């Protein structure tokens, strides 16, 4: 049984980890931390977990206690894992970080986008970017895994087949993405209030979103060179979900793009390439650890439109983190994640 610790268990990604791990036959949550809620039982804060964690309570983060775990998940704001990851790694504990702390390979680039110096630049070289569809082999032997963000997951999975095949004009990519309000986290903010977000949709961070350098970094690796990407995120009046509409111009219109995507993801348990002409819906992935993709070439021209949908809290965060844990410990990566999405 894998002994699990969770740092930052009161946010949406934290409770989603708890929900998923409650169904996992090979993992046991031994420690969950929260400075503000120390002493409170988990099922008192989250009644959906009643009957699953009858004795588990939040505690103040303690390196010695966390270091006794086999793996520790960080479901925290950026900057927190910087301070603790090194000590946990020294204790022999593996770290899976759901925050942005170790996603970017360049400490100066991270500081530019996150507004503070990187707190553990010495760990960046060994951090493995936890996108299993790209880095599965590296994940198997990692000590420190950086779980991709939600927008980066949906966008990269949608564009990687085109870039790997050298078919897309890498200098003119567009990602037009929509997110549910849970992507903003559980902290109170005016923009997340029901009366503000309901019955409305808006673009934000058009000048530059923090996920932009992460997406570019991954697409550069797939393309084998620089990419030009316009990324525009939008907030939509739904709780969960990412819908990415991705645009790329192809250099060879004779290629069967449906076959290309089907072959690229044929052995990926959590990527569903839908039949030609499909339009994936966010509701079809709600609560599930799956990315559904459809590829279109309108009017048979050189412009390709890829539609990619995920649940931002599952494949875009906690589900992908559990998928990484499964790979890391040599388990079937579908373990605890094979449930169907919720409909309606």
Swiss-Prot record:
EC assignment: 1.2.1.38
Enzyme class: oxidoreductase
Record's catalysed reaction(s): N-acetyl-L-glutamate 5-semialdehyde + phosphate + NADP(+) = N-acetyl-L-glutamyl 5-phosphate + NADPH + H(+)
PANTHER family with a match to the protein in the record: N-ACETYL-GAMMA-GLUTAMYL-PHOSPHATE REDUCTASE, CHLOROPLASTIC-RELATED, N-ACETYL-GAMMA-GLUTAMYL-PHOSPHATE REDUCTASE, CHLOROPLASTIC-RELATED-RELATED
Name of the protein in its database record: N-acetyl-gamma-glutamyl-phosphate reductase
The keyword Amino-acid biosynthesis appears for this protein: yes
Location(s) in or outside the cell: Cytoplasm
HAMAP family, per the entry: ArgC_type1
Annotated active site: 150
InterPro entries: AGPR_AS (IPR023013), AGPR_type-1 (IPR000706), NAD(P)-bd_dom_sf (IPR036291), NAGSA_dehydrogenase (IPR050085), Semialdehyde_DH_NAD-bd (IPR000534)
NCBIfam families in alphabetical order: argC (TIGR01850)
Keyword Transmembrane set for record: no
Lineage, highest ranks first: Bacteria, Pseudomonadati, Pseudomonadota, Gammaproteobacteria, Pseudomonadales
UniProt pathway: Amino-acid biosynthesis; L-arginine biosynthesis; N(2)-acetyl-L-ornithine from L-glutamate: step 3/4
Gene (UniProt): argC
GO MF annotation list: N-acetyl-gamma-glutamyl-phosphate reductase activity; NAD binding; NADP+ binding
Keyword field: Amino-acid biosynthesis, Arginine biosynthesis, Cytoplasm, NADP, Oxidoreductase
Protein family membership: Belongs to the NAGSA dehydrogenase family. Type 1 subfamily.
GO annotation, biological process: L-arginine biosynthetic process
Primary location class: cytoplasm
Gene3D superfamilies in the record: Dihydrodipicolinate Reductase, domain 2 (3.30.360.10), NAD(P)-binding Rossmann-like Domain (3.40.50.720)
Function recorded in the entry: Catalyzes the NADPH-dependent reduction of N-acetyl-5-glutamyl phosphate to yield N-acetyl-L-glutamate 5-semialdehyde.
């Amino acid at each position: 049984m894998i002994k699990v610790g969770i740092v930052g268990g009161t946010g949406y990604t934290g409770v989603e980890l708890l929900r998923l791990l409650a169904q996992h036959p090979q993992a046991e949550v031994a420690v969950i931390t929260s400075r503000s809620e120390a002493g409170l039982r988990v099922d008192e804060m989250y009644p959906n977990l009643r009957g699953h964690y009858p004795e588990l309570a939040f505690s103040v983060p303690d390196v010695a206690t966390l270091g006794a775990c086999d793996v520790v998940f960080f479901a925290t704001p950026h900057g927190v894992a910087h301070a603790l990851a090194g000590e946990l790694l020294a204790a022999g504990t593996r770290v899976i970080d759901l925050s942005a702390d170790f996603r970017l390979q360049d400490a100066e680039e991270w500081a530019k986008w996150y507004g503070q110096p990187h707190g553990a630049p010495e760990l960046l070289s060994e951090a493995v970017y936890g996108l299993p569809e790209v880095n599965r082999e590296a994940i198997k032997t990692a000590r420190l895994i950086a779980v991709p963000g939600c927008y980066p997951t949906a966008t990269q999975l949608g564009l990687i087949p085109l870039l790997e095949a050298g078919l897309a004009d890498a200098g003119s990519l567009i990602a037009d993405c929509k997110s549910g309000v849970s992507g903003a986290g559980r902290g109170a903010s005016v923009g997340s209030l029901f009366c503000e977000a309901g019955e409305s949709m808006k673009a934000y961070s058009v000048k530059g979103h923090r996920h932009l350098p992460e997406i570019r970094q991954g697409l550069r690796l797939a393309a084998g060179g620089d990419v030009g990407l316009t990324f525009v995120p939008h907030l939509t009046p739904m709780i969960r979900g990412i819908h990415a509409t991705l645009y790329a111009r192809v250099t060879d219109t004779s290629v069967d793009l449906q076959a290309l995507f089907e072959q690229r993801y044929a052995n990926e348990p959590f990527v569903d390439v839908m039949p030609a002409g499909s339009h994936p819906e966010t509701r079809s992935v709600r609560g599930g650890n799956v990315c559904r993709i459809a590829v279109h070439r309108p009017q048979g021209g050189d412009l390709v439109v890829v539609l990619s949908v995920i649940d931002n809290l599952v494949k875009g965060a906690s589900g992908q983190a559990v998928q990484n844990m499964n790979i890391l410990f040599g388990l079937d990566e579908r373990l605890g994640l094979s449930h169907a999405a919720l409909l309606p």
